[in-house]
Amino acid sequence: MAELLGLGCSHGPIILTPPQAWAKGRERIFARVPNYQPPPQLLQELGEDNGLSQDIVDQQHVVDAFAVLRERLHAWAPDVVLIIGDDQAENFRQDNLPPFCMYTGAEVDGYPFQRAAARNNLWGAAPETRYTFRCPQAFARDMRNALIRDGVDLASANALKGWEWGLPHAHINPLMFLDPEGRFPLLPFFVNCYGEEAGPDYPPRPTPRRCYEVGRAMRRFLATRSERVAVVASSSWSHSFLAHKFQCCAIDLETDRRNLELVRCGKGSTLAELSPEEIHQSGDHELLNWIIALGILGDRPAEIVDVRESHTQLAFRVTALWDC
């Protein structure tokens, strides 16, 4: 059986930027929501400085939490870093949008600062800055083949379109904190989390049950291997601008806190019972990435490193570790 280390983190573009830039990011999101009405908690957090005080606190928590993950990852020294994240029309668009895709190339590039929201970044890096990561090609091909033979209808790609940024931000953004040096071989796995939310030409997202089953199939493959594999679930949980039960104006604290307790207590498999409509209403589209990881890791209690539930961030952010 492969040795496993689990990591959970967020990937929102603001995590790459100084807190002084967060307000502008919020304003871009608010503008997308027709008749946007800020919830009372957001107004309180904005205070008299348009949220800067809250943003400074939250940004430091994000950086510190990633430092904990990085320290554990590098001390553990995996043979493979499997990052499960969603591609938001960065490589997969209406012409080809599978529910799941395994990357099988020998290497992959990422341009994390090419996106306008990350031009003003913590590293002072130029927009064209490129990061190249080597990938475990033979391992990825073996996993792809095993999953398909195990009943997972899985796409694979040995190159990315990545018109502007290569790796999706769900993968490259966490890597800027975890392993920008590319010390460990990277295996990207892509999930269509947004589904029809992106428009009528996009197919529905896979169900939570199916995502958990894919994770279990991955675990069955890993049971035949001897590598040390770090499994990274990359996403925030509920997003205010996707939470339809709140007219896309507020994060779903009640649902996220309930789900967090299940993950904390080692009952993550319960999340597979969520319905597609519950995911849609709560704005928890990206939770599907975590559900796949939970399928791999099994019902083990998580060490919760940090939780950010400020409405100023527009999403509920959890940082977690699993020692398996």
Residue ranges and their predicted role:
Residues D79-G85, F189, E227-W237:
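Beta-strand elements within well-structured catalytic alpha/beta cores of enzymes
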Residues A89-N91, S238-F241:
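Short, active-site-adjacent cap segments at secondary-structure transitions
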Residues D79, I83-F92, A159-W165:
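Short, glycine/charge-rich beta-strand/loop segments that flank catalytic centers
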Residues M1-W76, P98-E213, T224, A243-C324:
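Flexible, D/E/H-enriched segments
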Residues D64, D86-Q88, F221, R228:
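Short HxH-centered metal-ligating active-site micro-motif
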